Amino acid sequence: MNNNTTAPTYTLRGLQLIGWRDMQHALDYLFADGHLKQGTLVAINAEKMLTIEDNAEVRELINAAEFKYADGISVVRSVRKKYPQAQVSRVAGADLWEELMARAGKEGTPVFLVGGKPEVLAQTEAKLRNQWNVNIVGSQDGYFKPEQRQALFERIHASGAQIVTVAMGSPKQEIFMRDCRLVHPDALYMGVGGTYDVFTGHVKRAPKIWQTLGLEWLYRLLSQPSRIKRQLRLLRYLRWHYTGNL
């Protein structure tokens, strides 16, 4: 029988990743023995692997995060290629966030939401309360000034939040989480990018079949042809993968 409260780690180009078998494994790992882990969750895909390679500040930020997991199918395939016995699957960050929120609602875990447009954040709060009765102890949209950061950190600390999710895009959200943890270390932090927009229906996600086939990237490209430059950049990652430079 598999022990879902532990997980192996795998290394890709110096980055250590948690190997979750599936979503249930991820949840059981994070809520091991009924105690929510503390630290920072960071989703890793091919684009982020390239950024880590090219940007020393981002590399330092992400290396410091305790829980780095394979969000992109390319990363999962690279892990399986380098470690043929690895039982690792993609855990999409947007799905993990929703499952965390559902679990938090069930257990009464206090949650603080950061980021997004004011109207999107308000809709996210309302939907979380209606759908899972999430105990939201505070929120702040992404439109705050740099001089307001410290006061926000203090608000988060005073709220007693055990989960803090930050939708500011990378690397802004990683910088925010690093700095906030200096004031409020006893929580699980998660960078969620554009998840609030998807959750509230402002941005359409790829249909399940595209996700299952590992073609979510292609769906996004067809929906947003302007992403072509970003996709072409990923050819470098494919070279790493197919030449075994992992």
From Swiss-Prot:
<protein>
    <recommendedName>
        <fullName>UDP-N-acetyl-D-mannosaminuronic acid transferase</fullName>
        <ecNumber>2.4.1.180</ecNumber>
    </recommendedName>
</protein>
<dbReference type="GO" id="GO:0047241">
    <property type="term" value="F:lipopolysaccharide N-acetylmannosaminouronosyltransferase activity"/>
</dbReference>
<dbReference type="InterPro" id="IPR004629">
    <property type="entry name" value="WecG_TagA_CpsF"/>
</dbReference>
<comment type="similarity">
    <text>Belongs to the glycosyltransferase 26 family.</text>
</comment>
<dbReference type="InterPro" id="IPR023085">
    <property type="entry name" value="UDP-ManNAcA_Trfase_WecG"/>
</dbReference>
<keyword id="KW-0328">Glycosyltransferase</keyword>
<keyword id="KW-0808">Transferase</keyword>
<comment type="pathway">
    <text>Bacterial outer membrane biogenesis; enterobacterial common antigen biosynthesis.</text>
</comment>
<comment type="function">
    <text>Catalyzes the synthesis of Und-PP-GlcNAc-ManNAcA (Lipid II), the second lipid-linked intermediate involved in enterobacterial common antigen (ECA) synthesis.</text>
</comment>
<dbReference type="Pfam" id="PF03808">
    <property type="entry name" value="Glyco_tran_WecG"/>
</dbReference>
<dbReference type="GO" id="GO:0009246">
    <property type="term" value="P:enterobacterial common antigen biosynthetic process"/>
</dbReference>
